[in-house]
Amino acid sequence: ATTINKVCGSGMKAVMFGHDMIKAGSARLVVAGGMESMTNAPHLLMNSRTGIRFGSAEMLDHMAWDGLTNPYDKQSMGVFGELCVAKYGFSREQQDAFAAESVQRALNAQQSGAFSAEIAPVTVSTRKGDVSFDQDEQPGKCDIGKIPTLRPAFKKDGTITAASSSSINDGAAALVLCSET
């Protein structure tokens, strides 16, 4: 087992490693995937174990600090998205259209059952009873009509919004990869 800490990219990177192992002949069958629970990311009180001396101590958001902030200049990773937008000339309208189409495709896939055979429902017992999860809740939360009205998320005069960037949520997926031989 290997742990990969790449925030949203961890699962995809695990699948890439699995592919590489099969291609190299190190494995014939690999289970690869990832999970994250961003809603459970803690806040950190740095230096609390060794003793905070006189004065105040800063509390850090672990989710932002450990994965969504550039360690060198302390800028949000969203700012780098804005730099790519500027470099490649993506307009706000293009980003909004892509976000809307992405959500619509996800909704269409859910409604048609396109991936139903590939999804294993997960049931969680709560005080209020069992809750079954068998589809991504995120696409249904989006009001496609509001996408063009959203404010920029990372720069005051930016073009990337909550609709055209990754959401903060929890999720998990696993795939079985195998060699044809």
What does each model-identified segment do?
Residues 14, 41-43, 131-135:
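Short, well-ordered secondary-structure micro-motifs
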Residues 9, 39-40, 48, 103, ...:
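Short secondary-structure boundary/hinge segments and terminal tails
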Residues 19, 29-83:
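Flexible glycine-/small-residue-enriched beta->alpha junction loops
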Residues 1-29, 71-77, 141-167:
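Conserved catalytic cysteine-centered active-site region
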